[in-house]
Amino acid sequence: MSQMERLLERLDYIQEQILTLYEKDSVDLEDHIRLWNLLRRENAIWYVLRQEGHARVGGRAVPAMTVSEANAKFAIEMQIKLESLKASPYAAEGWSLQETTKERYLAEPSRTFKKLGQPVTLMFDNDPENLTEVVLWKWVYYITPTDEWYKARGGIDDTGIYYIDHESVKMYYVRFDMEAENFSETGTVTYRLGSALVNVPEPVTVTDSSSTRERTPKVLRPQGSRRRRNEETGEPVAPAPKRRRGAYGRRSSPKAQRRTAASPVSRGNGGSSDFTSGESDEGHRVRHRALRKKTAGVAPAEGHYLVGAKGPVNSLRCLRYKWKNKYSGDIMYLGTTFTWTESDGTERCGSGRFFCAFSNETKREKFLKSVKIPKNIGLFRAHAEKL
């Protein structure tokens, strides 16, 4: 038996075991650890096959070496994290396959395990078509640098969506000021919690995270076909994400004007503008209905028109590769994938990003109308005077 035959035989066996575990739908961490171990081995075989020059085997396309390598490394990370979680007090809770997926793990707050997500729909400028959806997780499981696991409860307030860490500090992973900065013209933000609408004190402005104010929100309840504002005292509850529309060219604070790109994301045309609720399968699933519409305001007269992409780094690399091959005639420059870091350290913040530049707004809008966006990737407009 040749080496090629042995590899293919091994690959078939591994893929059969992977399918068996998917069908088992176990809640045992040991099964999920085994699954990620199999995924690592599968990608190792794909890597070797591509290294030996095989583009297709048995009618199947062989992934690029960089893709297989990245997938294998991520599988190792997941296996190590799950083995550590299995040794923690939270192993006995029971973990579904969905709760240990790559999408759930990378959803904000990134590289944590999360349970019981609820959708929180944000509405900007009191416009029922200017919506986005984010996720509030009831429970967030994270590990410290000293390898200690903690279970944190999620919550929501006037500042944004957060979880409370083991030192009783609110760790925000969605900030309403940042959302409004990119998708609102007036700074008005309203979000739905169950059957009530909560009006964030307006206008929302960019503030330092250390100066968070605790306030009781105003609760808005719909009456008839129109939503009327009734002031009540209510304690926010946990939710998660949905759909949004952005505004371009709005006035922002000097601090906001210094930013080169926005953090919110979008994908494709949104569906119904009605508020809905329910557990989200993936964190930060966002549809940005107005991204493909030309919004009000004064567009920049000079410089470069940008489209930014945000999401899991591996998915971004695949998307960037596709754009490079398919839209090279439209895109002027295509940046590499990167992540933001804290200004006073090296800790990564949020998901990966990359930008592509267009010579004029017409080409950018044409691109946005034609491009297909994966479910776990979001897009946003940006502008730069120089590149």
Curated annotation (Swiss-Prot):
Question: What protein does this entry describe?
Answer: Regulatory protein E2
**InterPro entries xref list:** E2/EBNA1_C_sf, Nucleotide-bd_a/b_plait_sf, Papillomavirus_E2_C, PPV_E2_N, Reg_prot_E2, Regulatory_protein_E2_N, Regulatory_protein_E2_N_1, Regulatory_protein_E2_N_2
GO terms (molecular function) for this protein are: DNA binding; DNA-binding transcription factor activity; nucleotide binding
Task: From the UniProt entry, list the residue stretches annotated as the region Transactivation domain.
Answer: 1-205
As for what it does, the entry says: Plays a role in the initiation of viral DNA replication. A dimer of E2 interacts with a dimer of E1 in order to improve specificity of E1 DNA binding activity. Once the complex recognizes and binds DNA at specific sites, the E2 dimer is removed from DNA. E2 also regulates viral transcription through binding to the E2RE response element (5'-ACCNNNNNNGGT-3') present in multiple copies in the regulatory regions of the viral genome. Activates or represses transcription depending on E2RE's position with regards to proximal promoter elements including the TATA-box.
Tell me the name of the encoding gene: E2
Species assigned in the record: Human papillomavirus type 41
Q: What keywords are annotated for this sequence in UniProt?
A: Activator, DNA replication, DNA-binding, Early protein, Host nucleus, Isopeptide bond, Phosphoprotein, Repressor, Transcription, Transcription regulation, Ubl conjugation
Where's it found, cell-wise?
Answer: Host nucleus
